């Protein structure tokens, strides 16, 4: 089954294949399934970029998108995530994309459903497609990962982006630096070294800024937005100390004037909107992988045989 739960479960050669496939889609490749295929997007947390880019990717691939709104579904009547996914499988959906507030929600589904599941973010756990689009953006800029220094700055403890990126970047040969408030350090993450923010920015080839995950905090932030920006944000002054050729990434949504000065969001070094563009191509590659796996192993195999 071609699930995608976390990049840590994929070998590097498969990650490179997905990036190569995304580049082919960026260059204009067209792929269509041999027969109608259906996908449902189950987003139990707010999303703009991830949800819309998945929908764009699905339509570019010619897939049929089944509307699903948790607020108007039987989830409101107490239906479990498992029963929701099994229902969609039973009515003929070929794959589901899920964002959920619970860490590792997919473990209850991994061996229990017969259709591919694509993780669009699980709590503080993993965000594999965000990491893939970040990798694609970095590779477009530098050509490779070995020897690069990537500084991940901000709310490390609560960030699934930090967790996913640090692991895969380390496997790819990059040097990962962490920086941020002491109370948001993640001492359980072995894939980076903590340094002061000024050092991280000065050393980095890639400055990756993180949104403060207010919705995951048990307590409110002890700093005002202005204080956070001054202490930990990418200010105009800090940006002037970046290496020549260094780039700025941010998974968005961006809080202008908090983790990054508003003037830097679309500055020459910023690749923030390039990341969003790449997100469509990466998700096309991931969906193609899921659908081809479905053709080989699931209900679609029978359809495929019939239409030959």
UniProtKB/Swiss-Prot annotation:
It comes from the Bacteria. Signal peptide: none annotated. It catalyses: carbamoyl phosphate + L-aspartate = N-carbamoyl-L-aspartate + phosphate + H(+). Pathway: Pyrimidine metabolism; UMP biosynthesis via de novo pathway; (S)-dihydroorotate from bicarbonate: step 2/3. GO terms for biological process: 'de novo' pyrimidine nucleobase biosynthetic process; 'de novo' UMP biosynthetic process; amino acid metabolic process. The keyword Nucleotide-binding does not apply. PROSITE patterns: CARBAMOYLTRANSFERASE (PS00097). Keywords: Pyrimidine biosynthesis, Transferase. It is an enzyme of class 2 (transferase). Pfam families: OTCace (PF00185), OTCace_N (PF02729). Carbamoyl phosphate binds at residues 49-50, 99, 127, 130, 252-253. InterPro entries: Asp/Orn_carbamoyltranf_P-bd (IPR006132), Asp/Orn_carbamoylTrfase (IPR006130), Asp/Orn_carbamoylTrfase_sf (IPR036901), Asp_carbamoyltransf (IPR002082), Asp_carbamoyltransf_Asp/Orn-bd (IPR006131). Its EC number is 2.1.3.2. One of its GO terms (molecular function) is aspartate carbamoyltransferase activity. GO terms for cellular component: cytosol. L-aspartate binds at residues 77, 160, 211. Catalyzes the condensation of carbamoyl phosphate and aspartate to form carbamoyl aspartate and inorganic phosphate, the committed step in the de novo pyrimidine nucleotide biosynthesis pathway. Heterododecamer (2C3:3R2) of six catalytic PyrB chains organized as two trimers (C3), and six regulatory PyrI chains organized as three dimers (R2). NCBIfam families: asp_carb_tr, PRK00856.1. Belongs to the aspartate/ornithine carbamoyltransferase superfamily. ATCase family. This is Aspartate carbamoyltransferase catalytic subunit. It comes from Bacillus caldolyticus. The lineage of its organism: Bacteria, Bacillati, Bacillota, Bacilli, Bacillales.
């Amino acid at each position: 089954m071609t699930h995608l739960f976390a990049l840590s479960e994929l070998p590097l050669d498969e990650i490179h294949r997905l990036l190569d496939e995304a580049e082919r889609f960026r260059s204009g490749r067209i792929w269509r399934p041999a027969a109608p295929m259906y996908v449902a997007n189950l987003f139990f947390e707010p999303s703009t970029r991830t949800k819309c880019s998945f929908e764009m990717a699905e339509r570019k691939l010619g897939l049929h998108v089944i509307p699903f709104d948790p607020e108007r579904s039987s989830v409101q009547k107490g239906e479990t995530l498992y029963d929701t996914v099994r229902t969609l499988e039973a009515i003929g959906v070929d794959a589901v994309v899920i964002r959920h507030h619970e860490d590792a929600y997919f473990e209850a589904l991994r061996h229990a459903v017969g259709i591919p599941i694509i993780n669009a973010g699980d709590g503080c756990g993993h965000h594999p497609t965000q990491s893939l689009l970040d990798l694609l953006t970095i590779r477009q800029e530098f050509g490779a990962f070995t020897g690069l220094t990537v500084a991940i700055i901000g709310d490390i403890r609560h960030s699934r982006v930090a967790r996913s990126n640090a692991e895969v970047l380390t496997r790819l040969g990059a040097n990962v630096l962490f920086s941020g408030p002491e109370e948001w350090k993640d001492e359980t993450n072995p894939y980076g070294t903590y340094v002061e923010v000024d050092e991280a920015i000065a050393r980095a080839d890639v400055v990756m800024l993180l949104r403060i995950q207010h919705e995951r905090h048990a307590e409110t932030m002890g700093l005002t937005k202005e204080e956070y920006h001054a202490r930990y944000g990418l200010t105009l002054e800090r940006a002037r100390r970046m290496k020549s050729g260094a780039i700025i990434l941010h998974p968005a949504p961006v809080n202008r004037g908090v983790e990054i000065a508003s003037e830097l969001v679309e500055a020459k070094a910023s690749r923030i909107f390039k990341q969003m563009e790449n997100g469509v191509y990466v998700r096309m590659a991931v969906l193609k992988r899921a659908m081809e796996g479905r053709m080989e192993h699931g209900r679609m195999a029978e359809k495929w045989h019939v239409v030959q």
